[in-house]
Amino acid sequence: MHFEEHFVRLEALARKLFLAPLSVTRAELRKRISEQLRSEGFSPNTANAVTVRCYSDGAVEIECLDILYNSFALRALHPQAYLCRLSGSLLTENTSAKEAMLELNRTMGQVADEGVALWADEQGEVLAIDGSPVVAVFEDEIRFSRVGSGVEFDLAYNAVKAMGRNVIKEEICLRDLAKAKELLYIDHRGISAVSKFGESVYMDIIAEKVADNIE
């Protein structure tokens, strides 16, 4: 679950957006999550996804979901991606504005059968895919997006370093994607490998190895 890492990120985001700390302590939030999982009958033998929503008035809402896969597995879904231009970095944070944009993009992608949205800024830097941080695999290096963040993203970065691969955190631009061998995005749902973007077709060989090595 990596509760401590998630709590630190949640606290930092609350201070950034609301200019105030969370209204609950570590111990209180951990207890509330445990009690809600137990009261809703979630089994400790299956993977459970927990969403914590914090509001400007200090309210904290917890939603528990039973999922069928390991959070750090390579997902069976291999979508194609389409380009969506964004201005401003706030939509890459886990906010209600981001969720609204994601819902719109996903609906558009389904209607047009275009897959998931690849967000890029006006300068061509790739910000996210389906709202999640991006990794591009090249012939000689594995590049984690410099604007990417998240507990799972950091775990994947450490896993690649432990594998002895040449890994860097640097800008990923649209012009780089034609040279990439694999194009991935990582979040609590797991590691997702894009199958196609534009004229480029991608593999998932390294993605599977990374998933196997995340602790």
Where are these regions (language model features)?
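Helix-start/capping segments and mature chain N-termini
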Residues: 1-35, 39, 55-215
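Ordered, amphipathic secondary-structure segments that act as subunit-interaction surfaces
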Residues: 43-51, 61
